[in-house]
A protein has these predicted regions:
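Acetyl-CoA-dependent GNAT
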Residues: 1-63, 74-76, 80-86, 116-119
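Short, well-ordered turn and helix-capping elements at secondary-structure junctions
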Residues: 32-34, 59, 98, 111, ...
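Active-site acidic-Proline motif in GNAT/NAT acetyltransferases
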Residues: 61-63, 67, 98-99
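Short glycine-rich hinge loops at helix-strand junctions in the catalytic core
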Residues: 68, 86, 111
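Conserved active-site alpha-helix within GNAT-family acetyltransferase domains
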Residues: 71, 97-116
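Conserved beta-strand-loop-alpha-helix junction that forms the acyl-donor binding cleft
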Residues: 88-104, 120-123, 128-129
């Protein structure tokens, strides 16, 4: 739904399947935010979101977690982002639930740093591109 809603709002969405031997094991979606999706729901977007790339979704099937697929997917997503498909940007941001310590640790290990902003109830972390 998020990729569909992004069309026509000034945002671009790039969905990717995460596969092992041609079998899907997860999903990742990159977004670029020119005008915020938040205008649709009256929330003020985090400042780091405007004019920057985001990893909107990262999901790995439970059977394939703790095998490096998430870390590799993030690395490949950042490689893709650095081709500047929507133009240059300063940051890539990602957000996560505060109680999801595993996600927070993964994102920090990939270079993301929490910046004190929140996206709804989620913590925002950014990586300088």
């Amino acid at each position: 739904m998020q990729a569909y809603v992004a069309q026509g709002t000034g945002c671009s969405a790039f969905p990717f399947a995460i596969c092992r031997d041609k079998k899907p094991v997860g999903f990742l979606m990159v977004g670029f935010n020119e005008a915020a999706l938040y205008e649709l729901d009256d929330e003020e977007p985090p400042a780091s979101l405007k004019g920057n790339y985001s990893i909107w979704r990262l999901m790995i099937d439970k059977k394939y977690q703790n095998r490096g697929y998430g870390r590799e997917a993030i690395r490949l997503a950042l490689d893709f982002i650095r081709t500047w498909p929507c133009g240059k940007a300063e940051f890539c941001e990602i957000s996560f639930e505060p109680e999801n310590e595993v996600a927070g640790a993964l994102y920090r290990s990939c270079g993301f740093v929490e910046n004190g902003e929140k996206d709804g109830d989620e913590l925002v972390a950014v990586l300088k591109l």
